[in-house]
Amino acid sequence: MGKVVVFTNPKTVDFELYDDRPLESHEVRLKTLYSGISAGTELTAYRGSNPYLHKQWDPTRKLFIPGDQTSLTYPVSGWGYEEVGEVIELGSEVKDVSISDVIFGTWGHRTHHIVEESYARDRLQARSLDAIFGIFSQIGAIAINGVHDARIRIGETVAVFGMGTLGQIVGQLARRSGAKVVGVDRFEKRLEIALQSGAADVVLNASNTEVAEHIRSMTDNRGADIAIEVTGSTLALQQAVRSVAYSSKVIAMGFFQGEASGLFLGEEFHHNRVNIVGSQISGSDPELTYRWNRLRLIQSFMRLQADGLIDLKPIISHVIPFDDAGEAFRILDEEPEKALQVVLDFTKT
């Protein structure tokens, strides 16, 4: 029997048992080793703010439809997209994957999972990389996608608003792309880690700094060439708009919830011809769509880790036993100043 995390109601975490069915000939069974919790998307389901819980998403017309029907209802099972596991069983015709291979991917906070051989083959983790870092494959792909949307040029100043897990990764990638990165957050610990891990050249605490004015003073009153917003806060988006140069770009990567209060679109946005670009992993920059699919994004990020070009060890703040998943979600929800990447540990389950 396997076990999976379930949200039975907002802020209520439980578990369900499920059967481990026999394998088909080209399938592989994985035992989960670690699973990372997303502080953005997953917390929207945990808190009950996710729009799928309140409206119906029409995938054909790509519209959220108000009404009595919703796309999700509690209990919500199987959430989680930052997993890494070990191969423990092979189908009779599997040739390209071996027992004990480590596979990264997305299968939710569950103890076991079955994948096709091709899925596992495409996501074999380098032996040189500690297994726990496999949890970053998907969020790393999201970060690369956002940096691609930004179209950073060497020598540009990039302001990253929100130095949580995703912001830390975006900052490292932006610096690798030749940018000077200004990291912005309201939690001092995150700013310290951003400097330590190489995610920022300069940091600003938004709780005690007039960010837009400070960034302009750093750039001969020009403003940042690009701002990347990864908080999901409209207040941060407003500051990002205020911080960029005339005719510049803001990449909005955060998952905003509810109505957008705190935006003053008649001010800098209008007068400075600011372009806001939504960045989401379901699609890529149109110019790159032919060459960059999600698998390439994932594999590229894992290669950066294996080659030592990205340092994610400092951003793992908590490793918590899988059976204590409820406490892990509580920490992310109630103590964000203490938490970056929270990881569920299945190795003793």
Short names for language-model regions:
Residues M1-V76, D345-T349:
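Short N-terminal strand-loop motif that marks the start
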Residues L30, G105-T106, V160:
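A generic structural signal for residues embedded in beta-strands
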Residues D68, L72-W107:
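A glycine-/small-residue-rich N-terminal strand-loop-strand element
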Residues D96-S98, I152, V244:
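Short, well-ordered loop/turn sites that connect or cap secondary structure elements
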Residues R127-N208, E213:
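Mid-domain Rossmann-like dinucleotide-binding core that forms the NAD(H)/NADP(H) cofactor-binding site
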Residues D201-V277:
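Glycine-rich cofactor phosphate-binding loops and adjacent beta1-alpha1 units
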Residues A212-S217, L263-I316, E327:
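C-terminal substrate-binding/catalytic core of Rossmann-like NAD(P)-dependent dehydrogenases/reductases
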Residues N221, I251-A252, G262, V274, ...:
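C-terminal capping/lid region of NAD(P)-dependent oxidoreductase domains
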